[in-house]
Amino acid sequence: MASQDVQTAARTIIVASLNPVKIAATVQGFSEMFPGSAFTSRGVSVPSGVPDQPLGDAETLQGALNRAQRAREIEPDADFWVGLEGGVLEEAGVAGSPKLVQSFAWIVVIGRSRTGKARTAAYYLPEETAKLVRDGMELGPAEDIVWGKSNTKQTNGSVGLLTGDVINRKGYYVQAVVLALIPFKNPVLTFS
């Protein structure tokens, strides 16, 4: 069943990022969820309204939502606006040990009549990276230092480095984009 937001004519997706990995993951997620549909996409640079390295679920989700909303404000004639925001979550470790740090991302898809949201899986960062993040560094630059690489957030990302590219950053985001599109795939159902 085709949804009210995804039709047969080419639909325009605005991704609230200029990061080629985020744009490619978004397009792939839409294409997988709606295989008979045509999409055009472009990225725009918009502020997230949250710190450069969001901490916790609420702040990260707010960053993704802010990005999607701001993309809609500057490109109002599109059909979909997508915000992707990576975040970290600190949790208490064993007494006397440093806090553990998880990495994850939120994806928000705004359409003309509904909004979808999904969170990626989470994974723990190694202490070498976690210490830099706890000290205020963004995850991407922290991983670049730990791994001796540059600009990994626009290639395989932290998840790709840690899994040996079994899961790269694009693949990591694609699944969450698909999950954020559930309300659009099921237009007769109600999602809050």
Predicted features, each with a name:
Residues A2-A78:
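N-terminal polybasic phosphate/anion-binding patch
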